[in-house]
């Protein structure tokens, strides 16, 4: 049997599920995904429009399938739907052993609804149900953004018995609304007669983008106190989110009543954990966010960094909420408008995924045009 990397094995033993934030057909065909499962403790996969756009634009892996779809008269949207759901279905199949071994907690693959629907509740619900049926795998997650329009969609999709990955969460306030949407969805699922133990959810809390935005504002202020706070907000924000998670899923009567009927916790997932600032440790958003019942989805570069030199020292989150709040108090005191920061990040997050989706449309259209010649 192949040995797991000790650093990543230690991370897993501390209660953090290691997921890969990437997917391509090359990765599936080459056996690379299976290799990461066997040697780097990977037990899940997340995707987004940027990842699929990158996969489609590199090489010729998809040419034959797109040519076949073009011959059948498939349009751009249908082609994207087929190509992406085929990859996700294949990844789901690769991860079945991890899904079975974890009683459905891990072995998960996420696919995102069209980001152009981020502010349209009913269309998001409709597409989530369609994607669930097309992929047709029990270890699938449907990714729905935590926009105001996304929140009721999350509840409605969970109520259908569909597992959901809530994405683009930046603030603790919005995270509370996400947990409320989860509990509402599970209550409706119970009323509809669904088996609650089979419905899973994670809440994807974005980390590095918070530092990127706040550091930019701290640099503009330029005082010594401001500069000393650089690189602290992302981790502090996530630690406050974890304290809020425990408050809801360990202490609330509302969750307890669902737990009796088999409902699982909605695990926090640390997303955007690739370090963007070269001044910071490239394992910062992994080693500083170790906590039980969490997921960390990482680009392969970050997984490799943790494997090579990540120092895992057990739980680095529980009991840190007061220190994390102190960081936020200091940020507020020197003039950082956190409400504005989180609003900007949500809007920017949706816009980035929309831009990637539009690039994916253009890339696919070019492939279809080439195939038709």
UniProtKB/Swiss-Prot annotation:
A molecular function (GO) term: transaldolase activity
GO cellular component assignments: cytosol; extracellular region
Family matches, as InterPro entries: Aldolase_TIM (IPR013785), TAL/FSA (IPR001585), Transaldolase_2 (IPR004732), Transaldolase_AS (IPR018225)
Record-linked CDD domains: Transaldolase_like (cd00955)
Pathway: Carbohydrate degradation; pentose phosphate pathway; D-glyceraldehyde 3-phosphate and beta-D-fructose 6-phosphate from D-ribose 5-phosphate and D-xylulose 5-phosphate (non-oxidative stage): step 2/3
PROSITE patterns noted in UniProt: TRANSALDOLASE_1 (PS01054), TRANSALDOLASE_2 (PS00958)
Database matches in Gene3D superfamilies: Aldolase class I
A Pfam cross-reference name: TAL_FSA
Full protein name: Transaldolase
